[in-house]
Amino acid sequence: MDYSEIMVRHGELSTKGKNRMRFINKLKNNIQDVLAPFPAITVRSDRDRTHVSLNGTDYQPIVEALKLVFGVQALSPVYKLEKSVPLLVTAVQDIMTSLYRDGLTFKIATKRSDHAFELDSRELNSLLGGAVFEVLPNIQAQMKHPDVTLKVEIRDEAAYISYEEIKGAGGLPVGTSGKGMLMLSGGIDSPVAGYLALKRGLDIEVVHFASPPYTSPGALAKAQNLTRRLTRFGGNIQFIEVPFTEIQEEIKNKAPEAYLMTLTRRFMMRITDAIREQRKGLVIVNGESLGQVASQTLESMQAINAVTSTPIIRPVVTMDKLEIIEMAQAIDTFDISIQPFEDCCTIFAPDRPKTNPKLGNAEKYEERFDIDGLVQRAVSGIVVTEITPEIVNDEVENLIDALL
């Protein structure tokens, strides 16, 4: 027998009361986005399950994709069949025969939500267990911790049989906690911050600053590839490329070297906040980790934050670098992040950046700039691209390989 579908059990969203169906529908949409590369798949949801019908598709890549989607508590490959006792008997016998090995223990666990069905749960357990003994007389039944628990569900629309339960990613469906702008440089930290924001249901749009010719097409492709990795956890992500060359040249020419990083980050924060307001986001997310680099001391954060009253979420702020690296490896972004392309935070980086910049000094140096004009021109020049889980071709990978 081949699996008919993957049955998805919902996570934290099961506690969301009146908003339950909104959460479930969002999870369904996210699953559809993530499974877009598999056109035969169909998805439907009810109040306590989402059903992913395979329609002949190999189940293993579908399971691997679903394991990453936030809002999924657990999933099981299942056999779906008509609610017929003879069909159930045959299916249970076939499944257990295929699983049998010497010394195997099992139990039947039946759940009946269709109370019009001819047998109750206890009767089904007895009947189906007896059917297994008919074809496997040496198998042993065991009620506590058996090797195989064969779950049989009798629901209104059909019967379902499964024996495997696979842990999901947990968390909340992406998009159920509002929208935020992720400042993604291309380094190790910001993709991890994005992953953790997605886990709490935040719908992120990626803001990436590009300064050609100082930053290369490879750096841009790298940031887009990192964004594509993040789509595996909740579906499509808008990638916003911000032209930043003019601003960085202005800062380089007019500001003291020690304040280059502080002023650069202040402009990035202003621009991200303007984009957030334009695109109706609620928060800004970044990959700052306290004390890791000069711009991430408390004094630096205070001087940079002063340009906005928008909440700033820093998911990795208390994590050690090794912890961040381990998480980056676990979510498969690390190998991309360490590709050697310059980004806007590393070009023009001073040898001795100010670790305790004074807000008053930063504001005084910024009097040399047309701040509103620079920000407005950057925001008006953004390029928005929708990044999807589906890779139509290997253009991004080929570009990066060619440039390395």
Curated annotation (Swiss-Prot):
Residues reported to bind ATP: M183, L184, H208, F209, R265, G287, Q296
GO cellular component: cytosol
Residues of the THUMP domain: 60-165
GO biological process, one term: tRNA 4-thiouridine biosynthesis
Biochemical pathway: Cofactor biosynthesis; thiamine diphosphate biosynthesis
MF-aspect GO terms: ATP binding; CCA tRNA nucleotidyltransferase activity; tRNA binding; tRNA-uracil-4 sulfurtransferase activity
Gene3D superfamilies with a match to the protein in the record: 3.30.2130.30, HUPs (3.40.50.620)
Enzyme Commission designation: 2.8.1.4
Localization of this protein: Cytoplasm
PROSITE patterns: THUMP
Keywords (A to Z) from UniProt: ATP-binding, Cytoplasm, Nucleotide-binding, RNA-binding, Thiamine biosynthesis, Transferase, tRNA-binding
Catalytic activity: [ThiI sulfur-carrier protein]-S-sulfanyl-L-cysteine + a uridine in tRNA + 2 reduced [2Fe-2S]-[ferredoxin] + ATP + H(+) = [ThiI sulfur-carrier protein]-L-cysteine + a 4-thiouridine in tRNA + 2 oxidized [2Fe-2S]-[ferredoxin] + AMP + diphosphate; [ThiS sulfur-carrier protein]-C-terminal Gly-Gly-AMP + S-sulfanyl-L-cysteinyl-[cysteine desulfurase] + AH2 = [ThiS sulfur-carrier protein]-C-terminal-Gly-aminoethanethioate + L-cysteinyl-[cysteine desulfurase] + A + AMP + 2 H(+)
Pfam families (UniProt xref): ThiI (PF02568), ThiI_fer (PF22025), THUMP (PF02926)
PANTHER family found in the cross-reference section: TRNA SULFURTRANSFERASE (PTHR43209:SF1)
Family affiliation: Belongs to the ThiI family.
Function: Catalyzes the ATP-dependent transfer of a sulfur to tRNA to produce 4-thiouridine in position 8 of tRNAs, which functions as a near-UV photosensor. Also catalyzes the transfer of sulfur to the sulfur carrier protein ThiS, forming ThiS-thiocarboxylate. This is a step in the synthesis of thiazole, in the thiamine biosynthesis pathway. The sulfur is donated as persulfide by IscS.
Name recorded for this polypeptide: Probable tRNA sulfurtransferase
Source species: Streptococcus pyogenes serotype M49 (strain NZ131)
